[in-house]
Amino acid sequence: MIDRINADRLAFVVHVGDITSGRGPCGDQWLEARQKQFARFKAPFVLLPGDNEWLDCKRSGFDPLERLAKWRELFCIPVKELPLERQKGKYCENVRWQHDGFVFAGLNIPGGNNNLGDDPAEHGERMQAVLAWLDESEALARQRDGLVVLMHANPFLVRPIGADGYQEVRERLRRLGETMPGKVLLVHGDTHRFRDDEPLPGLRRVEVYGWPHIRWAKARIERTGARLFEVELMPQ
């Protein structure tokens, strides 16, 4: 797939997380091998964390926060030929860049109910940083042509019982859709299917495939059409 993506002339490539399965492997060797694999991309490459590479590593006997620290060590690095801004402090995985008049904001919001049930303190501290980053990105985007929000989790999953780890970000997305209608695109993964819809008024959502469907989606800015982005699901 990397070879097929490299054959296209892309401004950048984004992976929205889950670079291993929900049961591992989670060790350093696996992550380092993925780092070398991603280095093959010709276009600037941005990686966001999914739950499989830190939260779910508890199933393999790892400490999730230690695995997230290792992820940061390997992947919080400069991105070639892309003016990438990282959030200051320990949440370096929250990123932002601008391209062709649009603001792109990448957030550490993983699946697994965003870790609310297992570690409410971690969830709360991280989400405070995430929401501050999203608010800053929104302020920038209001001076530009629009905003693209990227994360791993599907924030629209309905939980039958228990606390909702995505309520805060969903409310932010609702506000964005209401105040910037048609100018906000949400891209996420997590639930392993392709969707291109409008889950909230004014908010367009694209979910990309996950295992076992190994496919990628290509987006193009299209200012003259009814939608700002043309999204095409590419062959395997």
How would you describe each model-predicted region?
Residues 25, 29-129, 196-227:
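Extended active-site neighborhood of metal-dependent phosphoesterases/phosphodiesterases
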Residues 3-12, 98, 105, 119-199:
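His/acidic metal-ligating clusters that form di-metal
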Residues 3-11, 41, 147, 212-215, ...:
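Acidic, histidine-bearing metal-coordination/catalytic regions of metal-dependent phosphoesterases
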Residues 20, 86, 184-188:
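Residue-level detector of alpha-helical recognition elements and their boundaries
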Residues 17-18, 50-51, 152, 189-190:
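Active-site glycine-centered loops adjacent to acidic/histidine catalytic or metal-binding residues
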Residues 1-28:
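N-terminal active-site segment of His-dependent metallophosphoesterases
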Residues 19-22, 111-114, 154-157:
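A short, flexible beta-alpha/helix-coil linker loop
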Residues 1, 33-37, 172:
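A short acidic, amphipathic alpha-helical/loop segment
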